Amino acid sequence: MNDGSNSDATATSSAAQRQVRVQLTSKQEDIALPDNTGPILVPTSLRRYALSTLVNKLLGNDKPIPFEFLINGTFLRTSIDEYLTANGISAETTLEIEYVRALIPPLHIASFQHDDWVSSTDVLSATSPAATWASATISQGQEKILSGSYDGLLRVWNMSSQIVATSPAAADGGHTASIKAAKFVTPNQIASAGLDRTVRLWKYAESDEGFSGTIAPQLELYGHKSGINSLAVHALSNRILSASSDNSVGFWSTKKSDAPAAPDDLLPSAASRSSKRRKLNSSVTVPQRGPLALLSSHTAPVSAAIFDAKDSTVGYSASWDHSMRTWDLVTSALVDTRTTSHSLLSLEHLPELNLLAAGTSARHITLIDPRASATTISAMTLRGHTNAVVSLARDPHSTYGLISGSHDGTCRIWDIRATKTDKDGAVGESVYSISRKSLEEQGRSDTKRVGGEGVKVFSVCWDKTVGIVSAGEDKRIQINRGEGVLSA
């Protein structure tokens, strides 16, 4: 007489042996299977590791590559069978599975200590925009890191954490207040801006051996009536965008000959006459110019202004007034306004996806489709930070990658394919969180502080050669690197 145990075993065996057809694809040519690779019948019990082994076998790799797998834009974190059950998908269908190189944790490489908070950072490397625009060759090991600090000084560092050059103090033509933004325009030119309301251009020169250099004042740009929060540069068109607390976006030329005269009432000489203060930069004469245009429409401080990554005649701005605005930089006309539910503090363009990422005061990142045809304001929300998101940079390795810097003391890496749907629509979660090394060195095991106290991140830059460079309240530049953190 059968006691039922055999039928139970048969059911278990049947579940284990259930199969599904999968079509394995990759968008990366160097790891893609041949076009004629058809659907493959695999057990639904397979998980990531077994699938990774299968793909390596199909590719004939001598040295296995760890892979991650995406189904309908979501990373596979269970068995295929569990995924099918959770999503109500029949095993009779052919499952499209995209594989990408597995994520590699971005390891700490170095930290550069400053005397004051570090507000901004940028990179000069063979793959950075400044070098690419200038068709310049930056040899391996000759990369430079630019930092702007609350002490009002710019510093250029080499990869051995040595200071190569420092900008002059206020009395010698430098900033007269804290710097909030700094960018390499070309390998020989730097732009900066800050609380002294000016945008400044500098000539950067290195000695032949590259161990020392100079940052010399080149041009002072006046037009804003309050502090400047961020800068964007586009060397090919010799243009700069600035975002100011006076509610306006500044549009400037990097060339003295193209720029109009500076407004008399905003020049230091006018301030000296009205307040009888000592003229701080009297020892140096630097050309002074005004803006090509001041774009006024925002009703609160502008936190960020950027160029469209594919069309430099288009600009975008984000503001404390909750809005993201699109500008025609040829005519200075406002083209479009997208209003969100929160103050916007940072902005980055993801051109291949037709999306703008905006960091908010509400601790999340909103992905906005700026195209006029878009029917919804927010295409996706990225959640995970515990304080304001004040800096964003796209992943140079991947169409889908983004990094954010937050006042919670962390940088988070996002793959916007890793999403789920809830009552608020599509929601993404970060794939990595980078803490401040300074906390580890203080012996704090949790490497976190409530609200990011003392370790707020103010700026983050992601360079294909150097890695992830972040700056913050801990008075440090921090470099982290993980080869191919995400996949294209």
Swiss-Prot record:
Residues 20-101 are annotated as: Ubiquitin-like (UBL) domain. PANTHER family: RIBOSOME BIOGENESIS PROTEIN WDR12 (PTHR19855:SF11), WD40 REPEAT PROTEIN 12, 37 (PTHR19855). The keyword Coiled coil does not apply. Component of the NOP7 complex, composed of erb1, nop7 and ytm1. The complex is held together by erb1, which interacts with nop7 via its N-terminal domain and with ytm1 via a high-affinity interaction between the seven-bladed beta-propeller domains of the 2 proteins. The NOP7 complex associates with the 66S pre-ribosome. Interacts (via UBL domain) with mdn1 (via VWFA/MIDAS domain). Gene3D superfamilies: YVTN repeat-like/Quinoprotein amine dehydrogenase. This is Ribosome biogenesis protein ytm1. The gene is ytm1. It comes from the Eukaryota. InterPro entries: G-protein_beta_WD-40_rep, NLE, WD40/YVTN_repeat-like_dom_sf, WD40_repeat_CS, WD40_repeat_dom_sf, WD40_rpt, WDR12/Ytm1. GO terms for biological process: chromosome organization; maturation of 5.8S rRNA from tricistronic rRNA transcript (SSU-rRNA, 5.8S rRNA, LSU-rRNA); maturation of LSU-rRNA from tricistronic rRNA transcript (SSU-rRNA, 5.8S rRNA, LSU-rRNA); protein-RNA complex remodeling; ribosomal large subunit biogenesis. Keywords: Nucleus, Repeat, Ribosome biogenesis, rRNA processing, WD repeat. It is found in: Nucleus, Nucleolus; Nucleus, Nucleoplasm. WD repeats lie at residues 128-167, 174-212, 223-262, 297-337, 339-378, 384-424, 452-488.
